[in-house]
Structure formats: structure tokens, C-alpha cells
Amino acid sequence: MAYSLTRKLLKDWKYFMRHPEKTQGLFHVRPHDSDLHLWHVVMYEPRTSLEVYLLLYIGGNDQDPYIIMKCLSPNCCFPINRTVSMTHLNYLLLKDLGLQDLLFHIWQPLFHIQATEDLQYSPSTVKFNRAWNRIIYKDFKSYFPELIGTLQPGDYSIVKSYSKNHNISNSNGGSVNEFMSSYNAQSHTFHAQDNSKNPYTNSSIGKSSMLSTLNNNNVNKRTHDYNAIDFMTKNLLACDDDSIHPVVSSKRSRTLACPDETNDNRGSEHYTKRKKI
């Protein structure tokens, strides 16, 4: 039941709010107002202070939830402002403190696999991401007042330059509330992946070839009707631990380069690649 799912998410969240040491300082989480399906998350790399702001939508029922992620900060792992299915990780939510396990798992490809000497960890990139989150998303301070700090001279100019170079319109900016309100709540139907034969259900967190999909499982399909924000079906990307690829998309989208890579085409390839469909 959806009620059981939100109750479990709330319980998990309250636990590590009471015990912040359990997060190891790697993430900060807040629900979107009173909506316990939608979560604001700041992933944090404590050695460099690099942060990535993202949204998680967790819906369905407590036995077979679906997970949709949208990164709001430029990064070298996931495309910005694109919806990515993380439903292949839904088995983590079945555990005690499952929300914490899920967040730890998402944290790893963002920071852990790449060496700290890489471009995305340079001081200028850390400065850029801090400025981006606070300038583009005005509600950032509402959800994470403890992270605000102060902007520095030049912050507005680097954010404006990056937006222009990557054709990111101001419609992506403003408050997160405005950002989310651009999607309409309506009824959708989707085919959830079948995890009944998932060999990783009881495995430890780690890099694997777990496949995720929302609509290409032809065996024992289970159809869920739900009311959710419309981004659930807009250019959805499927993701496993090794790759990202489109599920339903009218056109392909390239992952945005890191800020330091804007003018530096070195031909180096990130470990996250697209699969050709």
C-alpha cells in the first residue's frame, strides 16, 4: 500500500534526523512540504565539499516501489534536469533503514568511483556547484538552511555563463516549487519491472550489471495505475550501475560536461556511457 510506503520512508527519515552520524555527512534529505513521495536530497563529498542537488520521487507500494531521480546540479555522472529510473534499486527500500541504503547507493557513482583529483573535484567546480544550487534554485535555502553560507563575487557570472553555453533556460530556475509545478498531476499507467527473479535482491551494495526498465519487461508484467507528477513519463532514462540509456524519448540527450570541461575537450570518457537502443 502507498500509505505503508510513505510511513516507512517517514520512519527512516526521522531515524537519521535523530542520528545524523548515521549519514556520515554524505547527504542531507528533506521531504517536499508534506509530500512524502517527493524528496529533496543534497549529496555531499566531505573531503572536497562538492555537492549535488537532486530530487527523488518514490511511489507505488511498499513491496514494489518505483524510484525516479532528477539531478538539478550539473555533474559528470547523471544528466541535469532529466528523469532517470532508479527502480532497479527498489529492493533496498525493503530493508530496515532502506531510504538510507538507497541514498548511500546513489552517492557512490557521484563521488566514490572517480578519484578526487579528477576535474569535477577541482576548487572551481566546487565553487560553481555551490553557486548554482543557491542561485538557480531559490528554495534551496528553505530546505537546507544549514548549508546556505554566502555567495562570493563572480558567482552569478559563472552560473550565467554556464547556462548560456549549455542552452539552459531560466525555466529551469526559480524556486523548486515553481520547478515542480510545471508538471501536472494526472493518472498514468506504467509497467513496473519484475524483481521476483532479481539475483541482486539480497546482495550487498556494489557495482553490478543490474538492469532497470520501466516498460520492456515482457515476462509477468504488473501494471500499476497511480497519480504522480508528469515527469514520470517525460523522456525517462533507464539506469543501471554501469550505464544510462533512454526508455521513452523523442530525442537523445547528452550528459552535460562538468564546468571545468566546458572549454577543455580532452577526449577522456567517463565510465557512465549510453547504450544504443
UniProtKB/Swiss-Prot annotation:
Disordered: annotated segments: 254-277
Intrachain S-S bonds: none
Lineage top rank: taxon: Eukaryota
GO BP annotations listed: protein export from nucleus; protein ubiquitination
GO-annotated cellular components: nucleus
Sections of the chain in a coiled coil: none
Role of this protein: Not known; its elevated expression suppresses the conditional cell cycle defects associated with UBC3/CDC34 mutations.
Protein name: Ubiquitin-conjugating enzyme suppressor 1
Organism, as annotated: Saccharomyces cerevisiae (strain ATCC 204508 / S288c) (Baker's yeast)
Taxonomic lineage of the native organism: Eukaryota, Fungi, Dikarya, Ascomycota, Saccharomycotina
